[in-house]
Structures are given as structure tokens and as C-alpha cells.
Amino acid sequence: MIKRVSIIVGLLVAIVALPVLLRRKSATASPDAADDRLVIITPHNESIRNEYGEAFARWWKERSGRSVYVDWRTPGGTAEIRKVLDSGFAAAEERGAEGMGIDLFFGGGDYEFKTQHKPKKGGGRLVRLQVFDKHPEWFGEQGVSQTFSGEQYFNDDHTWVTACLSQFGICYNEDALQRMGMDAPRSWSDLGDPRYAGYLALADPSKSGSVARAFELLIQQQMQDAMVSSHSSEAALQEGWAKGWQLIMRLCANARYFTDSASKIPQDVGQGDAVAGMCVDFYGRSFSDELKRPDGTSRLCWVAPEGGSSLSGDPIAVMRGAPHPEVAQAFVEFVLSDAGQMLWNAKPGTPSGPVAKALRRMPVRRDIYTEENRSQFTDGDRNPYESTGNFVYKPELTGKAFGTIRSLVRIVGIDSHEEMKSAWKALREANFPPDAMKVFFDVSALDYDSMKMGDARLGSTEALDAAQRASELGARFRAQYQKAEAMAREAMEKGERP
């Protein structure tokens, strides 16, 4: 009996100790013992923070002989980061300081970096990156091109540069769809199918720049499709813009919830709590891996929507007044180096790969996609530069309305979600009476001519004015949803069926 207990205790000790014994010794120094320090604000997840913090610390030690402590600041998504930077720089300007204690901004969509480059108040908050002069061979058509598929990967002033690529798409639960007798979604429009009502997982675009970009791409696809089939470009833009918003309304009406955490979507879809959702590629592929069956298949699948998604960049920038500018510039150099680029997609445990978990991100440097390098990739079959999905983002169509779009999705579909869901249920039960549908999908308040440059009041620096405008629009849409529901129920009572 004593021998058996000893064996069990020994096994338990081994299980607890094994991860510690196998773990690679941390290269990151403690705050007190480090020779250098680096403060990075980021929306990146813990896996990316850990892997890039450790890898840079080793690289910096080899280059300089100095240890470094990486101080990660993670207030939330890009919306929260913007608030931190706005308040920090406002306070810095009041006391006459150049910066606000942050060295680097790492990750998030390019919209936030463009905003920090030229904020509405004060001077530019980003400084020129030395990597452009130090490594010109990393840029150009064979490296990091300035534009691709309509997306911008660095700006003319060289104050920000894309570090890796991402693509927004659709994740879905194959088993759940089979039980419902539905085909797998292949386009944004498929998610507007009423059969998804209560089963669609969405994220709040006001909290995440990448989620907001997905909604922008959805609208722009409708606009580009309308332009192909119309003789009048102006009329086509109006029509496509309206159709885009009506599709967003369908998606919002189908939504089970709107989460602040984009990573929650593939997790819930994989578990069957939702059937499908809008999801960025690396989250979808990572969770799909976790749910793989012995035969290599997974119930969670991810697909890029046909003709409706571009290759967006996640940039990096050094902040004005960075307290540790030399180390900050070196971090950018590391991220764009061969070692930093390989880390995004190399298999865990390989010399070029992460220690703990595959990051499933795609490098931005085109020259990294050699046959030899791709043999080490987790996604070795993917080369984003060879599969664009026949979609080219056109910033002139919706770029200036980006901030307005992210606010409007919240106003139209999130703040009034209960009224919207109730109306959508009544419309489905009444078999979609045309008059009620017309009221429900009325987007005349979102006219393209008045919105294409961005709604001035929604984007106002005066918080009270912006809130009042949002309240006015919100009241309008709640009223029309309630009216559409009443019309649908009246049609049912009268026995009117289209």
C-alpha cells in the first residue's frame, strides 16, 4: 500500500515538474535586473506577446550583450488603446513632455496607425522608422511592398510598417450545419440567411479595428458588385452602399450575441454554442487545430469569403518621445528580420518557430515564402500573395467612412439588438411581408452622399455632440424595427402571406 502511494506521489510530482523541466530558460530579464527596458502597447494575444518578448530578448542579448525587460501594456482592443494614447499624449502636452511613456505600438489594423500618425489634435505621434534606411533590401516588390490588393503596408513618411498579414473570413461548425441541413457558408451574403437566426456569432466593431474592417469590406464588396452590373457609377455606389448596410442588418438580426473578444467566436462555434461567425484567419485556424480529430479533420472550419476579403496588415510603430528609442527601433528591426518573420508561422519547436504554440500568422515579407521556409510553416500550403480571392480593396470608396462604419454598426445592430431580433422573428413568422420588410430595411438615414466622407457629428471631438447624434440615429432605427414588427404581426392576424 505504501509502495503504491509512493508511486502515485512520484508520478504526480513528475507531471507537475515536467513542463518546468522542458521549458526553455526565459531570456527576458526581470524589471529590476534588466539592462534595458521596452514598453509596448498592443492588442496582440498572450501567445504572441510571450513568443516575441522572449525571441527579441535573445536577439538583443546576442546583438548588444545587454538584457532587456519587455513591459507589455494590454488595455484591450484598438479602441481602448486609442483612448490610452489620446489621454496620455494630452497629459504629456499639458506638462510640456514629448512622449507619454510608451515605446511601441504593435498590432491592430492600419486605421489606428494612420490616426496616430495624424491625430485630430496635436502633432504626429509616430517617428520615422530606421529600418527603412538600415535594410532597404527588405522593401519593394520582393519584400514588403507599399500596397497590395489595395491595402497599404507602410506609409510615405515611414512612420509605421506592417509586421504580418491577416484576413477576415467565416468560421463555421460543419457538424452543426449538417444537422440543420445547411450548406457551408462561402460568402458574407450567406450569413444573412434567416436560418442562422440565433446561431451567428459576431464581434463589436467599436472595440476592434480588425472587426470594423470586416464590416467595411462587406459593404465595399456590395458596392464593387453593383458597379460591375451598372452603367452609372454614382447610382451603383449608392445602391451598393445601401445593399451593404441591409446585409449588415441581416447579420445583426441573426446574431446570437456581440462579443468584445474576437477570440471567443471560433471557440463558441467550435463548441456548438453558435453555428457560424465572422472571424480572423489565425483565430479560426488555431481553434480548428485544437479540435482536430484523429483522422485530421475538424468540426470547426474557416474560409475566406468569395470575393469579399483583402489581405490586411497588422503594423508596428515607434511612438514619439519613446523613453527607450534605441531598443524600440531595434524591436522593429527584429520583427521584420528573417527570424522575426519566420516566428509568425514556423512550427513550434523548430529552430525558427515559437516555443509553446503556433501563432498562425502570415509574414509580410514576400521573400520569406521560399520553398525551404514554407516547409517549416504551420500553414505551408498558404502563400497569401498567390491567393487574393479576386478582391481589391479601394480606399477611395469607404476609407474615409471607416470610423463612421464602426459607429453605425453599433447604432444599427447592437444598441437596438433586442428590438431588431424581435422584429426579425415576427418577419420570419409572417413569411417576410414586403411592406414590413421595406420598413425594417430602410437605410435612407445612412445615405452614401452624406456618409462617404464620414459623419461629422459621429466623429466629432465633442463627446456630447457625437453621443446626441448616435442617440438620434438609434431612436430612428428602434422605431422602424418596432413598426416593422407591428406590421408583420398585423399581417399574420389578417392571414396575409406573400
Walk through the language-model features, giving the residues of each:
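Hydrophobic membrane-insertion alpha-helices, especially the h-region
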Residues: S6-L21
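Early extracytoplasmic/lumenal segment of secretory-pathway proteins
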Residues: P19-P119, P266-Q267
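Loop/turn elements at helix/coil->beta-strand transitions in domains of secreted/extracellular proteins
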Residues: D35-L38, R66-V68, M100-L104, G123, ...
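Extracytoplasmic ligand-binding site segments that recognize negatively charged/polar headgroups
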Residues: P43-N50, R73, A79, G101, ...
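Short, hydrophobic alpha-helical packing/hinge segments within bilobed ligand-binding/sensory domains
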Residues: E80-L85, W188, I265-P266, A274, ...
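Extracytoplasmic/periplasmic substrate-binding proteins
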Residues: Y257-P323, D338-N373
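Amphipathic alpha-helical blocks and their helix-capping loop/short-beta junctions
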Residues: V355-I405
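Conserved C-terminal helix/tail region of periplasmic/extracytoplasmic solute-binding proteins
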Residues: P384-P498
